[in-house]
Amino acid sequence: VHWTSEEKQYITSLWAKVNVGEVGGEALARLLIVYPWTQRFFASFGNLSSANAILHNAKVLAHGQKVLTSFGEAVKNLDNIKKTFAQLSELHCEKLHVDPENFKLLGNILIIVLATHFPKEFTPASQAAWTKLVNAVAHALALGYH
């Protein structure tokens, strides 16, 4: 992926303001609420019976933080996203059997959550850079699938 200096600036400046626990937990919770079939990957997380239960599920929130912390590695390694996510791609493909389309869904939800948390900073140009990033991460995570 080729990044312009402006795109890198949009991504890194917004990322510096992100509360990984809050945004990550909210993004994963929204994924599970809006796309309930994704809940099958999180059966061990306990009560996912309602939106309220999901939004307050400690395991969902903790895993959301873990996911977004990992996503932060993409921000730090914009020029080598494929290598950054090679092991996670293999894990999600070989062991967890996650449908790679779910990575795109989560990326789209992350864009929405960022826009709601940072309405002033999330300009059309910023959104374009972030969309490019979440698509690059989703693609890198899908590479382990044959």
UniProtKB/Swiss-Prot annotation:
Gene3D superfamilies: Globins. CDD domains: Hb-beta-like. Red blood cells. GO terms for biological process: hydrogen peroxide catabolic process. Residues 2-146 form the Globin domain. Keywords: Heme, Iron, Metal-binding, Oxygen transport, Transport. Heme b binds at residues 63, 92. GO terms for molecular function: haptoglobin binding; heme binding; metal ion binding; organic acid binding; oxygen binding; oxygen carrier activity; peroxidase activity. It holds the Pfam family Globin. SUPFAM superfamilies: Globin-like (SSF46458). One of its GO terms (cellular component) is blood microparticle. Hemoglobin A is the major, and hemoglobin D the minor hemoglobin of this species. Belongs to the globin family. Hemoglobins A and D are heterotetramers of alpha-1, alpha-2 and two identical beta chains. Involved in oxygen transport from the lung to the various peripheral tissues. PANTHER family: HEMOGLOBIN FAMILY MEMBER (PTHR11442), HEMOGLOBIN SUBUNIT EPSILON (PTHR11442:SF7). This is Hemoglobin A/D subunit beta. It comes from Aldabrachelys gigantea (Aldabra giant tortoise). The lineage of its organism: Eukaryota, Metazoa, Chordata, Craniata, Vertebrata.
